[in-house]
């Protein structure tokens, strides 16, 4: 019954904001048409708004869970029109705070201690309130030196899980209906979108997980002059309550306050871009909700000329697979070099597109997207926009993207927006390019490769004895399969030639991999004999030969 009442309320809001056109051609539209005479007409003010603005206002009226839904949907620029996505980015996750005494009770249940014991002081008036949780100022009891540390306590809203479960169940029902009836359901993929929203909200409901995210990010940026991450107070953290050290700063979009504090905005903007690319390509752990409200600037007067960002809210973090990291970095470098052929090849090699796509068509599509950008001044070029438009054009060729890549697009867009607010003349390409080049050099340097091999040495030692038998078995199967091939036409001869080349490449690659394994084993065993630096000479020889074999295999593609 509650679900029916909730659905009817959603229907009324859809009609009042004139959003029924979004459901055109579905059974829902027919039901809404029947209900239309009983719903008050939209005001002239609402009717004059764009469709994106009307959707934003409707989501705000439906409540905090739908606000969160809209914020997540705004990241799916591969699914929704640009004008709607832009409006949804304006959604503000600010709601009326819940009672401070209720927050106190939640903290006590979470920590298993009275608040008066856990904290020397706890302010029941929240500092900030959002749809999932709200934040309270507090002070820890004195430590061994008698110091009382200022902290903030993030507390989940009461019964928020039940409310989210009910709304998500309704969204699943609506998604199933849309998938069965909407003419563009294969492009919209409604159930996939709802599943992504459900996963994001579930992650945000576990504050202990958010604390772990903050702890990992802090470890990566310990002692940095570019980014500060508050310390997690684990003794006062649980699933429904997260305690962090209290930090003071200026929101990164408050230009007037930054100028009044004498902050070097130009240096700060460049740092923001460098921090983002370092998080993505060095650490593979990036803050995926990096809007101005979650990114502050350290207000310490001593940091005016060497400013530092402060990260807040670690509920949504992003990671890419190693393959996506590599292909994305290579894609950016191909954009820098205007190498459209390579961009097209990378989209296929990464598995984002089917292997039977015509590379020349994809190359032409990439050229049509990128060339107009290169006529602009460098300060007006947005890498995020280029990437989003490339992926949107590639959808015509059955592009498949992982949610983490879509999350990265949105984060890159946010970071560029913050950077351009701080420094309107920021040349994002000039800042990003050397960072990417350095990271790619370091990522594939011999030292790093040997380090990775040494880290995997136990696994390699376990499987190494089986390698000769497996290689022999595989080669035997290939030879037998080749002898059974009956050459009947020029096409089959070409196929036979391709297979032989492939076999040669595979054998070369296996040989190279085996030599690298030998190099890693020698490096890990520390044998007697000659050394070059800290690495045995035979390890250098084996590693060099293995690398050469892999390079030959790669060049024979």
UniProtKB/Swiss-Prot annotation:
Pathway: Cofactor biosynthesis; ubiquinone biosynthesis [regulation]. Keywords: ATP-binding, Cell inner membrane, Cell membrane, Kinase, Membrane, Nucleotide-binding, Transferase, Transmembrane, Transmembrane helix, Ubiquinone biosynthesis. GO terms for biological process: regulation of ubiquinone biosynthetic process; ubiquinone biosynthetic process. The active site is at 289 (proton acceptor). InterPro entries: ABC1_dom (IPR004147), Kinase-like_dom_sf (IPR011009), UbiB (IPR010232), UbiB_bact (IPR045308), UbiB_kinase (IPR050154). It is an enzyme of class 2 (transferase). One of its GO terms (molecular function) is protein kinase activity. Its main location: membrane. It is found in: Cell inner membrane. CDD domains: UbiB. Disulfide bonds: none annotated. ATP binds at residues 127-135, 154. One of its GO terms (cellular component) is plasma membrane. It is a multi-pass membrane protein. Residues 121-509 form the Protein kinase domain. The keyword Transferase applies. The chain crosses the membrane at residues 506-526, 535-555. Belongs to the ABC1 family. UbiB subfamily. PANTHER family: CHAPERONE-ACTIVITY OF BC1 COMPLEX CABC1 -RELATED, PROTEIN ACTIVITY OF BC1 COMPLEX KINASE 7, CHLOROPLASTIC. Is probably a protein kinase regulator of UbiI activity which is involved in aerobic coenzyme Q (ubiquinone) biosynthesis. This is Probable protein kinase UbiB.
């Amino acid at each position: 019954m509650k679900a029916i009442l909730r659905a009817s309320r959603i229907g009324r809001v859809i009609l009042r904001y004139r959003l029924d056109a979004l459901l055109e051609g579905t059974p829902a539209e027919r039901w809404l048409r029947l209900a239309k005479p009983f719903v008050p007409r939209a005001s002239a003010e609402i009717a004059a708004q764009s469709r994106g603005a009307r959707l934003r206002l409707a989501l705000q009226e439906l409540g905090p869970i739908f606000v969160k839904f809209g914020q997540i949907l705004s990241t799916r620029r591969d699914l929704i029109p640009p004008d709607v996505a832009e409006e949804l980015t304006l959604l503000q996750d600010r709601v009326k705070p819940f009672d401070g005494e209720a927050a106190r009770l939640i903290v006590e249940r979470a920590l298993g201690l009275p608040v008066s014991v856990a904290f020397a002081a706890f302010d029941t008036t929240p500092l900030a309130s959002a749809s999932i949780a709200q934040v309270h100022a507090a002070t820890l009891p004195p430590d061994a030196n008698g110091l009382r540390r200022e902290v903030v306590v993030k507390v989940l809203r009461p019964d928020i899980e039940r409310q989210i479960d009910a709304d998500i169940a309704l969204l699943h029902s609506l998604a199933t209906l849309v998938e069965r009836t909407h003419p563009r359901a294969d492009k919209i993929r409604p159930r996939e979108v709802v599943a992504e929203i459900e996963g994001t909200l579930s992650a945000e409901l576990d504050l202990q997980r958010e604390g772990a995210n903050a702890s990992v990010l802090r470890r990566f940026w310990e002692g940095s002059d570019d980014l500060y991450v508050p310390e997690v107070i684990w003794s006062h953290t649980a699933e429904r309550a997260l305690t962090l050290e209290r930090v003071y700063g200026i929101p990164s979009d408050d230009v007037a306050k930054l100028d009044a504090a004498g902050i070097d905005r130009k240096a700060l903007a460049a740092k923001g871009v460098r921090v983002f690319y370092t998080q993505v390509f060095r650490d593979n752990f990036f803050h995926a909700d990096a809007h101005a409200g979650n990114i502050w600037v350290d207000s310490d007067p001593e940091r005016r000329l060497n400013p530092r960002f402060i990260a807040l809210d670690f509920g949504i973090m992003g990671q890419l697979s190693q393959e996506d990291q590599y292909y994305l970095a290579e894609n950016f470098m191909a954009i820098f070099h205007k190498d459209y052929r390579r961009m097209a090849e990378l989209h296929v090699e990464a598995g984002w597109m089917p292997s039977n796509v015509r590379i020349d068509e994809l190359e032409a599509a990439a050229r049509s997207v990128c060339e107009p950008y290169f006529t602009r001044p460098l300060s007006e070029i947005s890498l995020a926009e280029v990437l989003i438009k490339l992926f949107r054009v590639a959808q015509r060729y059955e592009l498949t993207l992982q949610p983490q890549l879509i999350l990265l697009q949105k984060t890159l867009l946010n970071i560029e927006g913050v950077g351009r607010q701080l420094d309107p003349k920021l040349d994002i390409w000039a800042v990003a390019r050397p960072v990417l080049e350095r990271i790619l050099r370091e990522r594939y340097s011999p030292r790093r490769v040997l380090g990775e091999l040494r880290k995997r040495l136990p696994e390699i030692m376990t499987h190494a004895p089986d390698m000769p038998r497996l290689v022999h078995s595989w080669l035997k199967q290939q030879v037998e399969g080749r002898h059974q091939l009956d050459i009947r036409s020029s096409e089959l001869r070409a196929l036979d030639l391709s297979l032989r080349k492939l076999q040669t490449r595979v054998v070369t690659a296996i040989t190279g991999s085996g030599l690298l394994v030998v190099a890693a084993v020698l490096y890990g065993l520390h044998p007697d004999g000659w050394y070059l630096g800290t690495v045995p000479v035979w390890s250098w020889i084996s590693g060099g030969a293995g690398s050469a074999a892999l390079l030959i295999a790669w060049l024979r593609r």
